[in-house]
Curated annotation (Swiss-Prot):
EC annotation from Swiss-Prot or TrEMBL: 3.6.5.n1
Keywords: Cell inner membrane, Cell membrane, GTP-binding, Hydrolase, Membrane, Nucleotide-binding, Protein biosynthesis
Any one GO molecular-function label of the UniProt entry: GTPase activity
Principal location class: membrane
UniProt domain tr-type G: residue ranges: 5-187
Alphabetized PANTHER family for the sequence: TRANSLATION FACTOR GUF1 HOMOLOG, CHLOROPLASTIC (PTHR43512:SF4), TRANSLATION FACTOR GUF1-RELATED (PTHR43512)
Role, per record: Required for accurate and efficient protein synthesis under certain stress conditions. May act as a fidelity factor of the translation reaction, by catalyzing a one-codon backward translocation of tRNAs on improperly translocated ribosomes. Back-translocation proceeds from a post-translocation (POST) complex to a pre-translocation (PRE) complex, thus giving elongation factor G a second chance to translocate the tRNAs correctly. Binds to ribosomes in a GTP-dependent manner.
Subcellular location: Cell inner membrane
Binding site for GTP: D17, H18, G19, K20, S21, T22, N134, K135, I136, D137
UniProt-recorded name of the protein: Elongation factor 4
Pfam families linked: EFG_C, EFG_III, GTP_EFTU, GTP_EFTU_D2, LepA_C
Reaction equation(s) it catalyzes: GTP + H2O = GDP + phosphate + H(+)
Amino acid sequence: MSISIRKKNFCIIAHIDHGKSTLADRFIQKAKIISDRDFKSQMLDSMEIERERGITIKSQAVTITYKSNDGDFYELNFVDTPGHVDFSYEVSRAISSCEGALLLIDASQGIQAQTVSNFYMAFEHDLEIIPVINKIDLPNANVDFIKKQIKNDLGLNDELAISISAKNGIGIDDLLEAICKYVPSPKGSIKDPLRALIFDSHYDSYRGVVVHFRIFEGQIKTGDKIRLMHTNSDYLIEEIGVFKILLERKDRLEAGDVGYFIAGIKNISDVKIGDTVTLCDCPALSPLEGFKEVKPVVFSSVYPVDANQYDDLLRAMDRLKLNDASLTFEKDSSSALGHGFKCGFLGLLHLEVIQERIEREFDLNVILTSPSVRYKIIPKKGKSYFIESPEQFPGNEAIESVLEPYIRANIIVPTEFLGNIMSVCLLKRGVQTNLIYLNTKRVELIYKMPLAEILFDFYDKIKSVSRGYASFDYELLDYEYTDLVRLDILVNGDRVDALSQLVFKDSARTKAVGICKKLKDEIARQQFKIAIQGAIGSNVIARETISPVRKDVTAKCYGGDITRKRKLLEKQKEGKKRMKMVGNVEIPQSVFLSVLKSNDN
């Protein structure tokens, strides 16, 4: 028996802020799966930070029932996906569990970098792509121009494009009819051995890991004994169901269904995203094609401001890891900042989100060190290895060469700002590999550049020089040779490990001067002179001096005898010299926080 033609699985993909979550809200309201009293905007964005920033961080699946104009009932399983490049892996998972995709395009902004990236991802997975022009209610909306972009830039049939306003609910019925008509029904048979793809999971404090999965073949019911094919571990199904905002329990799920199961799994790391679920008593012969394991690309250490809160921070990291398998961390320590954790993130936005969640959800104040990437060290003797922090960087005399990760940057910008964007990319060590005129008004730039150069202000700069019109997307390439050095900051000759950085040699002096000046402004004056230095190895490349606080020791001297005054000044000078020899400069953690923040900018 083949599965019902009335099931449709699709995802909503788009560039950031093109209206994906708003469209999902309209679908939910149309299906009446939640009362008007309980409804709120960004219904599928469960985290407070998602609502505040107006972004989607975690993909969310939901099942609705829709009665089409032909009188048939359709079960629509759809996934609302993130738009930011840091979370593109979430989009790839959603695409793998669907047969169709709604490609949302802002009627006022047109096709952007992430639009193109998501389109190709859906195209490579052979999804039926329905172009949707959103925000047609805006005064500067240009639907005809967007249709030309859809036809010329993406090669899609512009006549199939559906014009909507998700905010005002215009065109939603037409879009639902198009989904029922054009999105293919799932293939597969319930008679075949069970093969289901795990595409996500989350942790429930009471029931353990809740696994999100899509069934491609076979069927599953409560009480079945399942096997995860890659980890070869067996579990007993305690509960299965579908997503209808809240979890809705079902007795059985079959091929074509998107749902969840609970099987007493206590640790989220036991569930590998992309694994295949099958039955123990009738296993499938081969697993489904899974996903590449997500690897962190940005590294930073996190420390509690109050050293007594280390155990609280450990608990917070463990809890966050339960719901975010892409977060990695291990114990770390610093002489300046105490005990903390070295963490791996998917990008700067991911880092900011984790920091905010620690501070909000667990009421902890934390300091993060300067983000860095993973470098490859080829020593003069021995095998090559990777490092993620300045402390791991060996002396230059032991290194044969250093390699750093590169990216392929894809920037779409109006032609009037082309020169500005090229100047920014040049400053960031970018090498132009292609330039494509999409039309007379818009151009696509392809650059190869180091990942480390886009960590801090690259996105802000291209937005600034293009008045907000530039869009940016990137993908990781391979490692290439670089001229890397470790920049150390010394205060009175002592290295401050929390402020050490791995930097490109040509920009080392500029960074060193900036940090030294900032420290001079932040560190309180002492009764002795304080030297602040930026150094590469034994070579000092920048210096600032904080002059000592001087007491007027000659105030009690009267008359014109200069020798008495000289004796008092010499005595003061000797005392300050002894004080400098034995005095340690206490650097408050607020100073580290200020310097690290200014360094990010």
